[in-house]
């Protein structure tokens, strides 16, 4: 795949942090992308270019870095925005979806009225790793009767198999490692 000069500039700003959050992990730090206004704009513009013709009516941002991309994308698309959060963080009645971790379980919630039947929904997060969190949010969306259009990420860590779990045809990432 040929990468645009803009995405090459974005890739150059993502730094590797070895042994974070634990030994043996190389963390992809996106904060330099966010700190540079030109690079951040390139990212949002690339997301908008990909989704502008898909009639997205709602964008769901996944806690917490997904919020950073979902909000400006929803605004640019003229779509609504909602957020998927960890349990106990949303103030209204919620629906919950549990997903498995390597050692245990976690869950995410949406407000019960955040996504409605018939809406066309895009789920957004910063990084796709194993796909567990995104898959849980996708299940929340479809349980409400909405159409899950796709998942969109800044970065995909392809070696962790998240795209396969979500269904490769439903996954979009600006950058892959």
Swiss-Prot record:
Protein's UniProt keywords contain Lyase: no
GO MF term set: adenine binding; adenine phosphoribosyltransferase activity; AMP binding
Pfam families hit by this protein: Pribosyltran (PF00156)
Keywords tagged on the record: Cytoplasm, Glycosyltransferase, Purine salvage, Transferase
Pathway assignment: Purine metabolism; AMP biosynthesis via salvage pathway; AMP from adenine: step 1/1
InterPro entries found in the cross-reference section: Ade_phspho_trans (IPR005764), PRibTrfase_dom (IPR000836), PRTase-like (IPR029057), UPRTase/APRTase (IPR050054)
Reaction catalysis annotation: AMP + diphosphate = 5-phospho-alpha-D-ribose 1-diphosphate + adenine
Enzyme nomenclature, EC number: 2.4.2.7
Location(s), subcellular: Cytoplasm
PROSITE patterns given in the database record: PUR_PYR_PR_TRANSFER
One Gene Ontology term, aspect cellular component: cytoplasm
A biological-process GO annotation: purine ribonucleoside salvage
CDD domains: PRTases_typeI
HAMAP family linked: Aden_phosphoribosyltr (MF_00004)
Entry-linked NCBIfam families: apt (TIGR01090), PRK02304.1-3 (NF002634), PRK02304.1-5 (NF002636)
Oligomer and partners: Homodimer.
Family of the protein in this entry: Belongs to the purine/pyrimidine phosphoribosyltransferase family.
Biological role stated in the UniProt entry: Catalyzes a salvage reaction resulting in the formation of AMP, that is energically less costly than de novo synthesis.
Protein name as it appears in the record: Adenine phosphoribosyltransferase
Provenance organism: Anaeromyxobacter sp. (strain Fw109-5)
């Amino acid at each position: 795949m040929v990468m645009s000069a803009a995405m090459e500039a974005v890739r150059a700003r993502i730094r590797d942090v070895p042994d974070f959050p634990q030994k043996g992990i190389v963390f992809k730090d996106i904060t330099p992308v966010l700190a540079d206004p030109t690079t951040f704009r390139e990212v949002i513009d690339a997301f908008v270019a990909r989704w502008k013709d898909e009639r997205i009516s709602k964008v769901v941002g996944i806690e917490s870095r997904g919020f950073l991309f979902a909000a400006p994308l929803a605004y640019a698309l003229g779509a609504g925005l909602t957020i998927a959060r960890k349990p106990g963080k949303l103030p209204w009645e919620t629906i919950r979806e549990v997903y498995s971790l390597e050692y245990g379980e976690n869950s995410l919630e949406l407000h019960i009225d955040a996504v409605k039947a018939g809406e066309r929904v895009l789920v957004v997060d910063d990084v796709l790793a194993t796909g567990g969190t995104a898959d849980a949010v996708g299940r929340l969306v479809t349980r409400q009767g909405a159409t899950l259009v796709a998942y969109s990420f800044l970065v995909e860590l392809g070696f962790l198999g998240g795209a396969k779990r979500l269904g490769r045809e439903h996954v979009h990432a600006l950058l892959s490692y």
